[in-house]
């Protein structure tokens, strides 16, 4: 690492991903289960509300990215606004509604606020990292620091509620979670403010005219539509178990006390194996390595489908294996997308490419949340209650079998893309990913 990219600057930039990821876990995993269990929110209603909220969250990403480009000179102010919006929404969710008669409206409003703030911060943090340095090796280093801090944030968020609930009530534990978030975000906003005040981005987005062009739909439906389709199917496969992991652990495995341990194993595995996937990609290239990770995920889902009720040891192994696959899913889609942007000389609309990639997991969450909760409600499943063997079997099918099928489809599409595009593109993507290709 040279003097142009020092550790203090990497920490000031990357640390912000820690409180951001910390907030993301309760938003996308804990809160739906909390409101179903503690406030009696009907699963069909919850599924419908989540479907609408996730769609709003997904659709607004390209708009927020476009607006952030137009006010790029006010990036610090944008970060302040995003932080305040996220904090307000998360506080409302963690402290709960003033009365149960407004639970649906309270949950909906707070989720919209929180997810909007989360999107603003995520888009701008990724933009800053992507355009901080021109050098590809530097960009990979920057992304690695950001993702490492993010995984630490996820790990802390997984542990805090479980530890807090050993001494506090469920609601009090989430109040404690918000307090921890406030401390971490306070540190994060100070560091990122200092970073923005002392750091000049080396890479320009393009001319004002290029920035004003709204190319989101043409990006998704253009030459790279097969790549985006692979990502979308893969994200749905990952979203379903992420949404159902809490009821699965509590109502199928009957091991609610071990939830924090399971989540910790998952995120630790993701962090540990990220370096492993990076090394493998040096030999195989990013596409082939991602395909191998697909196979790991498929085998993991097969194993999860065979779990018996109360099989905590087997599920711990599933958590480690699925976390291993998580590292690849975090690493390779952005790396492959960078290769596409560079190959097609589309740097001027790079922000919108990343907005498109950010849109897909949120759209996947919308479909997964709406579909799974509505299906569970159809069979009479009740979160945190005594459910029949049939209802638990449906939960198992949704948690393991459906994602296994989807991941198999995603792997098939990726295999088709590799054969269709040929090994020339694979070599190009490997070179761009590792920073060995330079513009002539």
Language model feature labels by segment:
Residues 2-435:
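Membrane-embedded alpha-helical bundles of multi-pass transporters/translocases
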